[in-house]
Structure formats: C-alpha cells, structure tokens
UniProtKB/Swiss-Prot annotation:
Name of the gene this protein is made from: PRP5
Protein name: Pre-mRNA-processing ATP-dependent RNA helicase PRP5
UniProt biased composition (Polar residues): 1-18, 84-102, 235-245
UniProt enzyme class: hydrolase
Gene Ontology biological-process entries: mRNA processing; RNA splicing
Compositional bias per record (Basic and acidic residues), positions renumbered to this chain: 20-32, 70-79, 172-181
Limits of the Helicase ATP-binding domain: 419-597
Stretches of the chain forming a coiled coil according to its record: 20-87, 217-284, 310-382
PANTHER family with a match to the protein in the record: ATP-DEPENDENT RNA HELICASE DBP3
Species of the source: Lodderomyces elongisporus (strain ATCC 11503 / CBS 2605 / JCM 1781 / NBRC 1676 / NRRL YB-4239)
Length: 994
C-alpha cells in the first residue's frame, strides 16, 4: 500500500542535479514566455463562461493537463488563480501588492514569487536529503512491519504485500511523466481510501495494524524541478466573482484540511509506535525481495483478535495466555462423542459349537469342566468348552503355528473354556494360575478378529490392543503374537516407557494390527501431536493382561482414560492370576455382561511345581549360611546334568541383588541381575542373555519385577533367597517355573524370626495340598495367635481383601447364584447403617461421649445395638485449635482424637486400611493419621503420654470438615460391627431362592 504524503520534499528524486544555473535560466525564460502567451489568450477570450479545473486527474500524466488548457478561458482563470495563491501565502508583502489590478504588475509579481518558492524548495529539499532517513522513517512510518534503507539516496515505497510475513519494503520504481500538485493531492486521497480498505481486511488476521504506508510514486518528468514548475501551473485555479471580483481560495482550504489530516495521521502513528516498542521485534535481512533494503524489522506475533492499542493490560493478558498454553504439558486426551460417530460394523462371533459338545446336557458339561482342572464358569449362556484344536475350525495358517511352532498337542484347561467364550464375542474375566496358557487364550481370538477385518490405514490405529503392567510382560506378549506373523500379514508395535518414542511413532504412522503397550506410554502416544499420531477408533478387541497387578501399580485412572477413546461396542477380555475386590469393581465398569471363569484355585501354586522350605536359625552368620546353601543348590543342580537349565533367584531389595551377583561371580558362577533400578536397555540385555541357551549365563538374580510376565524356556528352578511378603507374590515367583505342563522346582529360604512370611508359605503349601513341616506349622500357629490377640496384622497382599470374598463365593453355592442373577442386594445393610447413623448423637458437648442407641424400631438396629453393647465406643470430641502432635506451618484449626485401640480386630482393620482412609480424606478434605501404640486387651503395659493407645488424629481447617470425617469413620465402625454380627449369626441356607 502507499503512504500518504505529508512532506512534499520527500517525493523528489535526489539523483538529479539541481544546482545547474543554465538549466534554471532556460526554464525561467520558458516559464515567462508561457505566462505571456497565456495572458494574451486570456485577454482575447470569449464570453464569461467559467469552468472549474479538473482536480481528479491523478496519475493521468502531462497529456491530460495539456488537454485541459485548450480553452482560453481556462488559461486565464489559471493565471489569475496562481496570482491569488501566491498573493495569499506571502507573509512579507503589503496589502497593496495583493490588490494590484494591472495584469502586467500581476505577471511581474508572479514571476518574482515563483523564484522565491523555487529557492525555498531547494533549501528544504537539501535539509531533508541530509537528514537521517531511518530515524525519520521510524517517526513517520512507525507501524509493525517496516523496511528501512540505510542509503543516503532513497527510493519511494511500492506496495508489496506478503500474506505470510507481511513485510513492506521501499523500492526504486518511478512512473513516467510529471505530476502536479492536484495529482498529488488526489493521489493522497485515493491512497488513504485504499489504506482504509486494506486495514479493514487485514484487521482480522493480525494484531498489529501494520500494513506499512508508503508515499505515492510521482510519474517521472524531465527532473524534479520540472515537476515542481508544472505543479505550480496546474495545481492552482482562479475564480472570478461577477459582483466584485472577489477571490475564493478553495485550494488553500483544501491544503489546510490535508495538513490537519496529515498531523492526525502522524499522531496515530506515534501512538502505534509506542505500543509496538513494548512488543518483541525480530531483525532479518531481506536481500532476495528488495536489493535496496538492508534491514527489515519484523513483528512476528500474530494474534487472532484485534487489540485495543490504548489498553496495555489487554496485551499482557494475551501474552500470558499464550505462555500458559505453551507451558501446559499435561497429557490430556480429547473427549470423543461416540454417539455422533458412525462406526463400521464388525463381526465378533466366530465360534461354532462342536457336535460332540452340542449333544451334552448341562450336567455333563459340568462334569467335563470338573475334569478340566475344576474349571468354574459363571454367567448366562456360557459356551461349552472344546477338547482338541481341530474343533475350533481355525485357518490352516493359525493351526500350523500352534502345532509346529508352539508345540501344543492339546489345549490347556483355561484355553478349553476361555477360547470358546472369547470367539463367541462375549466379554470375559479369566482367573487362572500362572503358566496355565492365558496368553494364547486371547491371542488366538484376537488373530481371528484381525483376519476378518481390513488392514488399518496409516493413522487409523490398531484393531487389537493389549495392555500390560510392566515392560517385560509387554515384550513377552509381543514375542508370542509375532509367532503368528510368519504365516499372515500381522504387524505388532510394542510401546513402553524407557525406550525411544520416535521409533514407536514411526511404526504407528505406517499402520499396525496390534499394539502391546503399558498404559502410560499409550497415553503419551495418543496425546502426541494433538492426537494425530494414532487413534483407537478402529480398535475392536481389548485385553487387560495381569489386570490385578495393573491396578495395584495405580494404573486405574490411565485405563479408564484409555477406554474413553475406544468405541463402546468393543470386546474386552480381562486376565489375571488373582481377583481382588477393587478389580471386580472396575470390571463391572469396563465389561458388559461378562462371563467369569476360574481355573483351579486363585493364588494356588501349580501341581507341576515341587515346593521346598528351608528354615535357618537367626544368627550372626545367617547371610553366610544362606549364601553357602545357595551355592550348594546351584552346584547340585548343574552337576545333575541339567547344564541347559536356568535358575532364577529372587531377593527383596535392589542392593541385595547387586551384592549377590558380586558374591556369585567371585565364586565363578556366571550370573546377571535385573531390577527396577537398572535402565531399560540393561534390563533387556539381561533378559536376552539369560534366555539365550548359548550365552553361558544360566543364573538370573532379580527382585519381584521378574515375578510376572517372564517366560524363559528351560527355567527349571526358582530360589527365593528372601521370602515374599504376601501370598500372591509367592505364587507368581514360583510360577516362573513349571510352565506349559512342565515340571519345576521352587526353594524358599526363611529364618525363625520371619513368622509372617512362614505363615504365608504354610498357607500356600496347604492350598496346594502339600505336606507341612512341624516346625513351620508351629511358627505359623504362634503367629496366628498374635493376630487374634491384635499383636500382629495379617498381610493384605496386592490389596487382596477381595480374595477371601472370592473364596467364600466359590464355596457357597447360594452366593454364587445370587451374584450370577443379580439378586444380591447390599442396600439393606447400608440402610441399617444409615438408620443407626441418624439415631446416634455424633457431636455432643466436649465432655460427653457418643454411644449407640439402646433401642430401635427395626430388628437390624436392635441386633446391632446388642452386639455393640459390649464394645466401648470411642468418643468424637472436636477441639478448636492446633493439635500438639502437629508442628510446622501446616497446622489446622480443628482436630479430633478417636481411640481405636480397644475396638475388635476386624472393626479396627476396616478403619485403618489405606483405601478406607484415602476415601475419607478425599471426601472430607481433612488429614487423618494413625498415632500411638497398640496395647492388647490383656497387656500389662500401661499407656503413657509419650506412647498413648492407638488412635486416629483428624485435623481440618473447619469444624464441618472434621465432623464429616468423624461421621464417615463412625459409619465404618458400624459396618464392621454389622459384619461381625452377620458372621456370628449366619445360618445355613439352601441352594435355591424362591
């Protein structure tokens, strides 16, 4: 766009010589002759007809001006108008000169004034040329994108719009012909209108009003002086007045308006310059687009909305918002409205019931499941199992892998029942012991799903998705799936943390059939690049492997977030070796009408594994004795000719693993360690070396990180150098051997002080129907007595409070039936608790204590009251102020001490469990901590101020928050009392419900 001209001196070209006297003299003579001719023609003009000069001929050139001077009358008017203009602008002439009536005198004065104006013009132009143009450009052209030349001679600007960068530079391009003052003014007006239009169009695109104005380009005349002389003769008009010869100076009024507009424009430009100085600028050199442009100042911040240049706070808010957007690194997934997406249909049902099974009735099928390692199936319309691979009617490409590569002559018990359920399109929960073939139970149906659908296009996402809790398990699953890729077009991508994400992104962009991933890394990939790397909209088959471990590691929020990205009609399969309560609750959320199958027993060691417990005496030489025993076991193992066998040794801590490796290496026993403290590349290297039969490393020292998902061929011996802390960990550790029907051996080291661990081992031996040593049984019985007295606490395992419930469900047919048909209702018990809560005075005065009501209108409340009558109910006294137990800046304003030492063991455990306290803390916004020391009921020790009885300290900022926490704790107590009552008064029930 062009820049409105406010200083006419800027429009001249300094490349032409202005001080040649000869040229100036010739031009003056030419001008005088022209004036004489015009004056003569004006005196002999016809009529009194007057015409106004045409001032809208900008850019028409000298040809249009000459045409306008054809009539004599117009020539006379222009001469008279020129005289009036010069006469009005002169500040040092008398009024008598301005009122001269003689045409000769007017002509003389006109020539004199023209000479003075020429000299003034020369002086002004010289001063402008010598001035520092970049500084003037900064003052007059202060817009966002401006190009400044550093040369002494400058070119007039030319419009050059760049939609990408919007950089405007000055160019050296003149037009041909001369332009007068009127053309200049009209071109200015035209340029302003054009600027206004462009500014309105571009205001939506960027913040800075920044289209740089530039001055109009005059058409080239003979030189600049000729332009000025011609402008004098063509820019002035003279109007005669019939009444008295009154002179009207319209041109002066127009020039004053233009000067006012120019001043206003300069003020606006100065305001914009002040705003732009507060914003970042970037300097760049632009030699490609304009040879005469040395420096280009660019403002490259583009906002979507136009800002108020008078409001600096508005600019700061926008900059802060943009900074916060850049700093927001949270991995948030886009919400998907599945109701608005029309997903393509897919087939789930592939299973055809074998003829042999279709002829069996339910009783015969139950007997068949009993023979298959006591398989139990719960749900509606459970498909019958199969017995041979041929009954599945799988493609030949799949059958060749099963029989030749995998070497499975017949399916395992869980495969016999799980594969028909999954191939029937049903959601399933599979609970089976480790090494029972769970992986193949979902790999075969997933492969069948993939074969029935088109290969995903790049960016569409996988058809099958397998989630695992650990990297090692993910790699093991990928290895099993890749065995089927040799006979079919199957592409698998294993995504896990600790590895290069760029390679995983490259594989996903090319397209894959299956993704095996850990939840955290999968969310990273789904959120990367705005969700354009991959999606889960094509996913129709989802597997959660080792689901119990996944939820114990805190992956539940990530899993729920992932499931929001998958189509609702997907098929979901969940496999686990244990099934705690919280896993059961989540299964109800993500599964639709599932079938639950249980093979063998939950947390039971496989019958193919022989178990041995070695008891040590607690002495100073305990570690040396254990190392010596381990060395003897390894020597005996390898001396028996099992040179190709592998040995896995479990320890409790990472430092113990490294120390044991150094000890064995000193004894010339090749070994390697793996634990969570090692990098992913070191862990992969350790597993690869241990799995390779030719590596020479047959001993692996590991923590419980290798207890799940590690499937190594010829792993014949597992040694627990340190015993596990809970039953599930023990089952998974020893489950690394004896896999796929092979025999294995497990040896565990314990000392006589590890009573808790010994009780776990004794329980595992009994559950697997193994003989128990009398010394071990004696220590276990001693520990159980301590538990009953409250001195010790039973291990909770992987949050495994649901294990006892599952065992009771399996043993009680009535509960199985109720849960299957949805008749089991917990509202009655909750209602009783609610009624009790409403009748109890929770918060009396500080000196009074709360107690259960003595009577109630309902039988349940009466029974609960009688049960609780023998229990000393703790008080809930809320005290205002800071508790003495808490120090530091986080003191609260209210607190309450609830003594739980004298509560029954079951009630006390139900309150202090981490999951229960976490829910109460989150709901009430308080802090709850366990303080004091446990004193058994028959203990002779007396509580002291330093060591009071076991109690809960509730702290909150408000009384209401502490009251809410106390109410929730009281409800937990009531639930515990109700559970005790049901256990004590439960009567035998029948199998059927009428």
């Amino acid at each position: 766009m062009t820049l409105p001209s406010g200083d006419s001196s800027i429009t001249n070209n300094t490349n032409q010589t202005l001080n040649e006297d000869e040229k100036r003299r010739l031009r003056r003579e030419k001008l005088a002759a022209l004036r004489q001719k015009k004056l003569a023609e004006a005196q002999n003009g016809e009529g009194n007809k007057r015409q106004e000069g045409n001032g809208n001929g900008t850019g028409q050139g000298t040809g249009n001006v000459a045409a306008d001077l054809t009539t004599k009358r117009n020539e006379k008017q222009k001469v008279e108008n020129s005289f009036a203009k010069l006469n009005s602008t002169s500040i040092d002439h008398s009024s008598t000169e301005t009122q001269a009536t003689s045409l000769e005198e007017k002509q003389r004065l006109l020539l004199k004034r023209q000479g003075q104006r020429i000299e003034d013009w020369k002086k002004n132009r010289s001063a402008d040329t010598a001035s520092h143009f970049p500084q003037r450009a900064k003052e007059n052209l202060s817009h966002t994108r401006i190009a400044i030349t550093k040369k002494s001679t400058f070119k007039l600007p030319k419009i050059k719009r760049n939609n990408n960068k919007r950089v405007f530079g000055f160019v050296n391009e003149d037009k041909e012909g001369g332009g007068g003052k009127e053309e200049e003014d009209e071109e200015e007006e035209f340029t302003k209108k054009k600027i206004l239009k462009i500014a309105n169009d571009d205001a939506r695109d960027y913040l800075n009003y920044g289209e740089k104005f530039r001055k109009p380009v005059l058409e080239e005349a003979e030189d600049d002086l000729d332009q000025f002389i011609e402008s004098i003769s063509k820019s002035e008009s003279f109007v005669d007045n019939n009444n008295g010869g009154k002179q009207v100076q319209e041109q002066n009024v127009e020039e004053e308006k233009q000067q006012q507009q120019q001043q206003q424009l300069e003020q606006e430009q100065e305001q914009e310059q002040e705003q732009l100085e507060k914003l970042p600028r970037y300097l760049a050199v632009n030699n490609n687009n304009n040879e005469d442009t040395d420096e280009v100042y660019r403002y490259e911040e583009d906002f979507d909305d136009e800002f108020d240049e008078d409001d600096e706070d508005d600019i700061n808010k926008r900059l802060s918002a943009k900074l916060n957007k850049l700093q927001n690194t949270a991995k948030e997934l886009k919400e998907i409205d599945h109701t608005s997406i029309e997903y393509p249909k897919f087939r789930k049902h592939f299973y055809q019931v074998p003829f042999e099974m279709s002829t069996m009735d339910n009783r015969e099928l139950d007997m068949l499941r009993l023979e298959l390692d006591n398989v139990r199936a719960r749900g509606k319309n459970v498909p019958p199992p199969f017995l041979t691979w041929g009954q599945l009617l799988m493609p030949e490409s799949v059958m060749s892998v099963i029989q030749n590569d995998l070497g499975f002559a017949k399916p395992s018990p869980i495969q016999c029942q799980a594969i028909p359920i999954v191939l029937s399109g049903r959601d399933m929960i599979g609970v089976a012991k480790t090494g029972s073939g769970k992986t193949l139970s979902y790999v075969l149906p997933m492969v069948r799903h993939i074969q029935d659908q088109l290969f995903p296009k790049p960016g569409e996402g996988p058809i099958g998705l397998v989630l695992s809790p650990t990297r090692e398990l993910a790699l093991q699953i990928e290895k099993e799936i890749l065995k089927f890729s040799s006979t079919m077009d199957l592409k698998v991508c294993c995504c896990y943390g600790g590895s290069n994400i760029e390679n995983q992104i490259s594989e996903l962009k090319r397209g894959v059939n299956v993704i095996v991933a850990t939840p955290g890394r999968l969310i990273d990939l789904l959120a990367a690049n705005g969700g354009r790397i991959t999606t889960l909209r094509r996913t129709t088959f989802v597997v959660l492997d080792e689901a119990d471990r996944m939820f114990d590691m805190g992956f539940e929020p990530q899993i729920q977030k992932i499931f929001t990205q998958i189509r609702p009609d997907k098929q979901t399969v969940l496999f686990s070796a244990t099934f705690p309560r919280k896993l059961e609750q989540l299964a109800k959320k993500v599964l639709h009408n599932p079938i639950e199958i249980i093979v063998g027993g939950v947390s039971v060691v496989a019958s193919e594994i022989s178990q041995e417990i070695i008891l040590f005496e607690d002495t100073d030489q305990l570690m040396n004795h254990k190392i010596q025993k381990l060395e003897d076991i390894l020597s005996r193992f390898f001396d028996l000719g099992k040179n190709t066998g592998k040995v896995l040794v479990f320890v409790e801590k990472q430092t113990d693993a490294d120390k044991l490796v150094s000890v064995l290496l000193k004894k010339a026993i090749p070994c390697i360690a793996i634990h969570g403290g090692k990098d992913q590349i070191d862990r992969k290297h350790a597993i690869r070396e241990f799995s390779d039969d030719q590596s020479g490393i047959n001993v692996l020292i590991a923590t419980s990180i290798a207890a799940r998902g590690l499937d190594v061929r010829n792993l014949d011996l597992v040694v627990n150098f340190e015993p596990p802390s809970h039953l599930e960990d023990y089952v998974h550790r020893v489950g690394r051997t004896g896999r796929a029907g092979k025999h294995g051996e497990a040896i565990t080291f314990v000392d006589n002080t590890q009573e808790k661990e010994i009780s776990i081992l004794v329980k595992a031996l009994k559950m697997s129907s193994r003989a128990v040593d009398s010394k071990l049984q004696e220590i276990a019985d001693k520990f159980m007595k301590k538990i009953e007295s409250g001195e010790e606490k039973r291990s909770s395992g992987f949050g495994g409070k649901g294990l006892e419930k599952l065992q009771n469900v399996r043993e009680t047919n009535m509960q199985l039936q109720k849960k299957m048909f949805g008749n089991f209702k917990k509202e009655d018990g909750k209602k009783s608790h609610r009624d009790l809560s409403e009748q109890v005075d929770y918060f009396g005065s500080s000196s009074s204590s709360s107690s259960f009501p003595s009577s109630s209108n309902t039988t349940t409340t009466t029974t609960t009251t009688s049960t609780a009558s023998a229990i000393e109910i703790p008080t809930f006294e809320i005290i205002e102020g800071n508790s003495p137990e808490t120090s530091g800046p986080d003191k609260c304003k209210f607190y309450c001490r609830v003594t739980i030492n004298d509560l029954p063991q079951k009630v006390r455990w139900g309150i202090v469990q981490r999951e229960s306290l976490s829910k109460i803390i989150e709901a009430s916004k308080t802090s709850i901590t366990t303080r004091g020391q446990f004193y058994p009921p028959q203990s002779k020790q007396t509580p002291t101020n330093d060591q009071p009885k076991l109690y809960l300290l509730i702290e909150g900022l408000t009384r209401k928050a502490v009251e809410e926490a106390a109410v929730l704790i009281r409800d937990k107590m009531l639930q515990g009392v109700e559970a005790m009552r049901l256990d004590n008064h439960s009567a035998p029930t029948g199998r059927y419900v009428v």
